[in-house]
Amino acid sequence: MATRTYNTISICSGYGGIELGLREVIPVRTVCYVEIEVSVAAVLAARMEEGYLDQAPIWTNLKTFDTEPWRGKVDILTGGFPCQPFSVAGAQLGEDDPRNLWPDTARLIRGLRPPVVFLENVPGILEYYFSTIRPELREMGYEVTEGLFSASETGAPHKRQRIFILADTDSSGSRQDREQTQLWASGSEQSSGTSGVSREGEDGEVEGKGRELDESRYVPLYPPGPGDRDGWALLLSIVPEAEPTFCRTLNGTTSGVDLRLRAIGNGVVPAVAARAFRVLSEKLKKQGNFPKL
């Protein structure tokens, strides 16, 4: 069993999906979040208030984050730096995109020197990863492994493939380190062992099972017009199930996407983060590399 709680700094935190996933694997405490989006930072603050996330300060700008006060106090750096420069949904400008925050992420890694780095991004980052990110991590003294994971592997109804990267500063490891890594990797599936990025167990789609509805509870509805806010409010107060699953955008009550949906869309599925950490820890163990925590 783990002997202590490991401190993490979360960059480009989103709603804290990576941190929630890590909790399923090892005892961690987030000591600082870095998140520039005001609406998403508000979600983080709300989740801290509700007790879902660790209470910690939120720094708003990765570019101005001072690593000096945190040096030697952080065990793991986690983050999913912006995917827009590499996503197929955008222009894929890569390293030329001003939103590319890998150089700033690398600055934090050099300044903090965390024993372990755990990162996430879209598959479109692969070329940049092999040409820039992995070589730079190795130059910093890290052993690096990576894998392709999808939400469907953990039972979600959507694929949502993501690249996860696990980097470790130590290549030998003490007995305690080896035992700790074995704990992290316990219950994980065996990795493919191939070079480069491997697809870590595409298990196929999981068939969803919806609950049966008691039709006797329902009466015919005649929905109000799109602009009739009072009418919609009355109807949904009587039959809240009538509100679309894709909330607050299709029922005429608002013209914008709910901020929670934006946070979810940019975030990490916690179960996928947990699985990725277990599998990649197992890879490092097989290679003789053990997180020095």
Regions found by a protein language model. Name each.
Residues V269-V272, V279:
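Nucleotide phosphate-binding/pyrophosphate-handling subdomain across enzymes
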Residues Q55, G94-P98, P270:
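Flexible, glycine- and charge-enriched loops at secondary-structure boundaries
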Residues A2, F65-V74, Q84-R262:
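Class I S-adenosyl-L-methionine
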Residues A46-P82, L166:
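Short, structured active-site "lid" loops
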Residues F277-G288:
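Short, hydrophobic alpha-helical segments
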Residues Y6-K63:
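SAM cofactor-binding core of SAM-dependent methyltransferases
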